[in-house]
């Protein structure tokens, strides 16, 4: 009986060994190809770096070469697999050296670019973006290279007399998201990179304020080694990240940081979107006052909500936080959209007016917008200013519609009482303006009237509105009733009910009559209203502020205006 020699390999084993050898040979060839490719790319990048070409074209061409090199790097086998290739110690050592040389070439390319121009730190941001788009690209060895380049930059900026690194905010946003990654090795490298970045930003700040830039002058001490310095405050702690980033970055860079995170809310990766939301909200809670370009951010949120509202609550919370620190900018932007407002815009209005602390500022901004006249051209507005970027000014219409949302809120009760005279008078102006433009505005002409009714009802004057409704006043006002008769009727009805806001309203009307409104029709409305309410017993209401000689002269001016309003007795009849 024949026996098989144990040393004899079967055909299957021979085939397996052959496949393994070819596979290893393929890996070796891939390393050699990466090595030769990176050497070639390095020479091209350095040649472009030394040429006198347009900086933007130079950067774009270099970025394409960097991306090509990046592609070679990420498909390389891991170091452990490289070690498996060798059959002897010398061969393994050669493969390891080749592996490390490839990484060193890529690192040298980046450091040579950054050493000449800190603007090219933007390349690191692009690398992080590439990794965020494909999880297979997110490798510890790439993060180590990024950290080494940032560490090299730290040593350079300590000797600079000026630091211009405009991409720090965008780079910080990408790194901050990786500080909450599931892989501890990625978290370690990202948090370390964040410390390097913030050190660069602190140097930039200190140079700008003529402070010394040695390591002792910063709370973020320059690390002595990667092993010793583990900034645990950044690891899985989004609140700390937001605090330190907000404290360190200059306003323009912090704005870039916020805008970048805002864009991440639309990421198809739920983890990225969730982490971005947390860091974004923390940042605005701590440092919203440093954010610039608020109008642009509000507009970006509106467009994102229109396209995709998966993170709607977070975006609306951003509106709320920005309104707390920049109410005027937020409200002006929210009023500069088509009228009538869509559901998305109304939700943003509600978010903007959710805090009682900013209610007075919101109403003051709306009153400022309501100084404009719908359809008024640029050259007809006082001092040549406009309230809208459009050919015509329709922001007052949006403001009237917004008041219908703001005024009934309980958080606005105190502010509405404070600004009742201004709101009442301004809305009467707007009702008149809209009645003039009714053929053009159509249904939109009723927003001012609706806002006026809401103001009456939320100011304890429901009976006034009921009386006006019984008299069919609102319907007539929107049809063919002479508006000056309407002003007289509103004033008379308010006077009959002895509305509690009478002293403040009379004082404000008198102030307007003395100072003179911007338009002649405003003057007519003010004086008709003022004359009507002045028939109330002023002594009983302690309206000692009514200086009759001046008022008489204003009333004479009213009679002389050629506005076809008839005699005042006709108006009162």
From Swiss-Prot:
HEAT repeats lie at residues 118-155, 252-289, 292-328, 357-394, 418-458. Keywords: Repeat. InterPro entries: ARM-type_fold, Maestro-like_HEAT, Maestro_heat-like_prot. It comes from the Eukaryota. The keyword Repeat applies. This is Maestro heat-like repeat-containing protein family member 9. It comes from Homo sapiens. The lineage of its organism: Eukaryota, Metazoa, Chordata, Craniata, Vertebrata. The gene is MROH9.
């Amino acid at each position: 009986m024949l026996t098989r020699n144990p040393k004899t390999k079967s055909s299957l084993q021979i085939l397996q060994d052959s496949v393994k050898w070819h596979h290893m040979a393929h890996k070796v060839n891939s390393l050699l190809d990466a090595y030769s490719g990176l050497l070639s790319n390095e020479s091209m990048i350095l040649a472009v770096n030394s040429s006198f070409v347009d900086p933007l074209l130079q950067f774009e061409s270099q970025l394409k070469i960097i991306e090509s090199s990046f592609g070679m790097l990420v498909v390389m086998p891991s170091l452990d697999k490289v070690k498996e290739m060798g059959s002897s110690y010398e061969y393994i050592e050669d493969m390891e050296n080749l592996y490390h040389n490839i990484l060193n070439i890529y690192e040298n390319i980046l450091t040579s670019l950054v050493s000449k121009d800190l603007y090219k730190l933007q390349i690191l941001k692009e690398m992080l973006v590439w990794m965020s788009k494909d999880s297979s690209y997110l490798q510890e060895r790439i993060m180590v290279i990024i950290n080494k380049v940032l560490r090299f930059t730290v040593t350079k900026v300590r000797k600079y007399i000026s630091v211009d690194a405009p991409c720090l905010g965008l780079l910080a946003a990408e790194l901050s998201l990786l500080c909450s990654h599931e892989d501890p090795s990625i978290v370690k490298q990202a948090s370390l990179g964040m410390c390097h970045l913030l050190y660069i930003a602190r140097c930039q700040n200190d140079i700008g304020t003529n402070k010394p830039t040695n390591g002792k002058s910063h709370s973020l001490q320059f690390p002595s080694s990667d092993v010793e310095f583990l900034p645990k405050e950044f690891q899985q702690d989004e609140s700390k990240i937001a605090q330190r980033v907000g404290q360190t970055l200059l306003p323009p860079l912090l704005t870039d940081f916020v805008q970048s995170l805002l864009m991440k809310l639309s990421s198809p990766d739920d983890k990225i979107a969730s982490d971005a939301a947390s860091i974004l909200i923390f940042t605005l809670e701590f440092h919203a006052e440093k954010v610039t370009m608020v109008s642009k951010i509000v507009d970006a949120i509106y467009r994102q909500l229109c396209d995709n509202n998966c993170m709607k609550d977070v975006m609306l919370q951003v509106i709320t936080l920005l309104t707390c620190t920049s109410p005027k900018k937020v409200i002006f932007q929210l009023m500069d959209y088509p009228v009538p407002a869509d559901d998305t815009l109304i939700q943003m209005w509600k978010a903007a007016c959710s805090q009682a602390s900013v209610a007075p500022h919101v109403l003051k901004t709306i009153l400022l917008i309501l100084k404009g006249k719908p359809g008024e051209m640029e050259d007809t507005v006082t001092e040549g200013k406009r309230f809208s970027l459009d050919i015509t000014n329709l922001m007052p219409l949006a403001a009237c519609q917004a008041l219908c949302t703001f005024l009934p809120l309980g958080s606005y009760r105190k502010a509405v009482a404070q600004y009742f005279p201004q709101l009442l008078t301004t809305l009467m102006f707007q009702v008149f303006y809209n009645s003039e433009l009714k053929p053009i505005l159509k249904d939109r002409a009723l927003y001012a009237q609706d806002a006026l009714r809401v103001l009456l009802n939320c100011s304890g004057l429901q009976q006034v509105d009921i009386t006006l409704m019984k008299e069919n006043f609102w319907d007539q006002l929107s049809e063919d009733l002479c508006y000056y008769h309407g002003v007289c009727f509103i004033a008379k009805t308010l006077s009959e009910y002895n509305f509690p806001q009478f002293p403040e309203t009379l004082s404000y009307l008198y102030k307007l009559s003395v100072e003179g409104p911007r338009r002649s029709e405003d003057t007519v409305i003010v004086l008709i209203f003022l004359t009507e309410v002045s028939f109330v017993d002023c002594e009983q209401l302690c309206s000692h502020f009514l200086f009759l000689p001046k008022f008489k002269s204003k009333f004479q001016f009213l009679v002389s205006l050629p506005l076809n309003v008839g005699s005042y007795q006709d108006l009162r009849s």
